[in-house]
């Protein structure tokens, strides 16, 4: 993939998460789901189709995410093959309510945000579903 600047292909989603665990820690499945949501949005931007997750090369959980946290998941395009797309994912905690202030409604924006998880994964978008793929990305594969 020479010549094409992939840095412009990224997707960001943000939301407030909750937990059903007694210690208030958010399920790791919720974090992976956030990667999937950001990744699907990225796939729509690139191909006009959500594609299919093939595998994660790596997934790292680096810091806990708690009930009430605001998180930002980012998916970035790293490489494009004929039908495969390699992506990186990051999840940052951008605001926290746990242990902040005297009230249940207390919270604060984190500066800098906390990197809570990261991953690298491969997705597949069959050729017949690549309806919006930019010509430069098609030529590169």
What are these regions (language model features)?
Residues 66-67, 76-141:
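HotDog/MaoC-like acyl-thioester-processing domains
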């Amino acid at each position: 993939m020479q010549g094409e600047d992939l840095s412009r292909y990224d997707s960001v989603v943000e939301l407030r998460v909750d937990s059903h665990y007694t210690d208030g820690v958010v399920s790791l499945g919720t974090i992976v789901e956030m990667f999937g949501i950001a990744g699907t949005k990225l796939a729509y931007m690139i191909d006009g189709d959500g594609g299919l997750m093939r595998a994660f090369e790596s997934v790292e959980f680096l810091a806990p995410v708690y009930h009430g946290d605001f998180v930002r998941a980012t998916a970035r395009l790293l490489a494009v093959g004929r039908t495969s797309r390699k992506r990186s994912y990051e999840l940052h905690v951008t605001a926290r309510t746990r242990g902040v202030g005297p009230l249940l409604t207390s919270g604060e924006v984190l500066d800098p945000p906390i990197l809570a998880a990261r991953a690298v994964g491969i997705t597949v978008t069959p050729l017949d579903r690549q309806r919006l793929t930019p010509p430069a990305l098609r030529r590169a594969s």
